[in-house]
Amino acid sequence: MACTGWTSPLPLCVCLLLTCGFAEAGKLLVVPMDGSHWFTMRSVVEKLILRGHEVVVVMPEVSWQLGRSLNCTVKTYSTSYTLEDLDREFKAFAHAQWKAQVRSIYSLLMGSYNDIFDLFFSNCRSLFKDKKLVEYLKESSFDAVFLDPFDNCGLIVAKYFSLPSVVFARGILCHYLEEGAQCPAPLSYVPRILLGFSDAMTFKERVRNHIMHLEEHLLCHRFFKNALEIASEILQTPVTEYDLYSHTSIWLLRTDFVLDYPKPVMPNMIFIGGINCHQGKPLPMEFEAYINASGEHGIVVFSLGSMVSEIPEKKAMAIADALGKIPQTVLWRYTGTRPSNLANNTILVKWLPQNDLLGHPMTRAFITHAGSHGVYESICNGVPMVMMPLFGDQMDNAKRMETKGAGVTLNVLEMTSEDLENALKAVINDKSYKENIMRLSSLHKDRPVEPLDLAVFWVEFVMRHKGAPHLRPAAHDLTWYQYHSLDVIGFLLAVVLTVAFITFKCCAYGYRKCLGKKGRVKKAHKSKTH
C-alpha cells in the first residue's frame, strides 16, 4: 500500500507503522485438539489473528467446540465417525472413571474404555486422504505449525511439510516430553504422572516411581500403536514418538512452578501456566442475585469440569447431603439428574462463569476435580479448594495443592457425606488455607510478562526465524550410550584397569626378581658353610 499526498508527519508515521505491521505478519497453520484443550489454545490463536497474522485452522468436521466463531480461515476434513459415535465413546470413558480411579499407567493405557482415543488418532488419516486439502496446505507456504500434540496429528503435519512447530500442552503422556526435549527428569525427586507423590519421596515411593517409569517404556508404545501406524503410513517411513516430538522448536507448557515442583528444564521450554486466567468480568444478573442473597456467609462454587455431566445417583445424593450442611450458598454446575435431597442452599446451573465467580470477594471455597484450568483459576483468584480428582493429571494437581496447604483432597469414589462436609468446613473456616492460596496467587502473578503475551511472542518468534535451532540441545545428535557417557566411562575404566594391570605385572615382576636374587644369595651362603 503506497502512501502519497500527505504533508503532515502524523499520517506518514501511522502509515509506516501499519506497513511494518503488515511486513511482520506471518502465515500460521493451527492443528488443535477438541474439548477443554481448545479453550486455552483458542485465546492464543485469537490474539495472533488480532495481531494481523494469517491463520488457517485445520480441524475435523465432527467436533464439539473446534473452530466456532473464529475470524480466520477454517479448513475441515471428513471423519470416519459421527458426532453420535464421539459422544457415545466419551460417555463410556467418563462413566468408567466412576467405577475405579486410574492409579497406574497400565490401567490408564490399557483400559477397555480407551476407544475414544483411537477415534482421535484416526483423524490424521482422514486429513491426508483429503488430497485437495493436502495440496492446499503444501502450496500455502506456512511459517510454522501451532499444534496440540495429544492425537499426534499436528506433529505428523509438521514433519510431513517440514515446518517448524510450536507445541501447546499441559504435559505429555508417558516420557515423551523428557525424551522429545532431551530434558533430564531425575526419578529421585521428579514424580511420574498418576502416582500423586510429592517431590520429597520416601524410599518406597522412589522405588514405585522407578517401576512406573519402566512401565511407561513397556506400555506406552502399545497405547500409541495405531497412531504410529498412521504416522508411518503418511510419512512413508517407520517412525517413533521420539521422531515426531524431537523436531519441536518451542514447547509452550501450561504449567507454572507455583503448581508444579521444581525440576530441570530446557531452553526451548516456555512456561505459561495460568494462561486461562482472565480479568474478572461483571457477573450476569442471575448470579449477582444468588451472591446478594447469600448474606455474610458467601458462596461456594462447585464444578467438576465440562467432562462430567452425570454423577451416579448414590454419590450425587451424598454430595447434596454434605452441601446442605454448610451455611454458604452453593452454585453447582451440574446437568445430570437432580438429587432428591438437594437442600435449599444449593442451586443447580447448567453453566456458570467460573473465573468471574472465583474472582468475587464473597466466594469462600471452590469444589473442583482439580483440572489444570480450574486449579489455575483458583490460584489466580486466591480461593481455597476441596479437590475431588477423577483421572489424568488431576490426582497430581490435587497432591501438589494439598502439599502447599491450599486445599483438601478427597477420594471421590470412597468419600462419605461427612468427609465432604468436614473438608468444606476446614477450607472455609481454617484461615491457613486462605493464607496459603493467597501466597501462591501473589507468587504466580509476580511476573514480567503475562502468559498469553509470552505464548504469542514465542509463536511469532518461531514464525520470524523459521524455528529455534539455537535452542536445540546437542543431546539430540548423540546415541543413548554417548548421552549417558557410557563410552567415556568404559574408556576410562579400561585405562584404569590397564594401568592397574601393568602396575600389578611390574610389581609382580619386581617381586619375583627380588625373591629370586635373595634365593640365590642364600643358596651361595649355605654352600660356603658346608
Curated annotation (Swiss-Prot):
The keyword Glycosyltransferase applies. The keyword Membrane applies. Glycans are attached at N71, N292, N344. It is an enzyme of class 2 (transferase). It catalyses: glucuronate acceptor + UDP-alpha-D-glucuronate = acceptor beta-D-glucuronoside + UDP + H(+); 2-hydroxy-17beta-estradiol + UDP-alpha-D-glucuronate = 2-hydroxy-17beta-estradiol 3-O-(beta-D-glucuronate) + UDP + H(+); 4-hydroxy-17beta-estradiol + UDP-alpha-D-glucuronate = 17beta-estradiol 4-O-(beta-D-glucuronate) + UDP + H(+); 2-hydroxyestrone + UDP-alpha-D-glucuronate = 2-hydroxyestrone 3-O-(beta-D-glucuronate) + UDP + H(+). The modification N6-succinyllysine is found at K99. GO terms for biological process: flavone metabolic process; flavonoid metabolic process; liver development; negative regulation of fatty acid metabolic process; retinoic acid metabolic process; xenobiotic metabolic process. Keywords: Endoplasmic reticulum, Glycoprotein, Glycosyltransferase, Lipid metabolism, Membrane, Signal, Transferase, Transmembrane, Transmembrane helix. It holds the Pfam family UDPGT. Residues 1-25 form the signal peptide. Belongs to the UDP-glycosyltransferase family. Homodimer. Homooligomer. Interacts with UGT1A1, UGT1A3, UGT1A4, UGT1A6, UGT1A7, UGT1A8 and UGT1A10 to form heterodimers. Isoform 1 interacts with isoform 2/i2 suggesting that oligomerization is involved in negative regulation of transferase activity by isoform 2. Isoform 1 also interacts with respective i2 isoforms of UGT1A1, UGT1A3, UGT1A4, UGT1A6, UGT1A7, UGT1A8 and UGT1A10. UGT1A9 isoform is part of the UGT1A complex locus which displays alternative use of promoters, first exons and terminal exons. The locus is defined by 13 first exons, which are alternatively spliced to 3 other common exons and 2 alternative terminal exons 5. From the 27 possible mRNA isoforms, 9 produce functionally active polypeptides (UGT1A1, 1A3, 1A4, 1A5, 1A6, 1A7, 1A8, 1A9 and 1A10) called isoforms 1 (i1). Use of an alternative exon 5 (5b) as terminal exon is leading to 9 additional alternatively spliced products termed isoforms i2 and which lack transferase activity. This is UDP-glucuronosyltransferase 1A9. It comes from Homo sapiens (Human). The gene is UGT1A9.
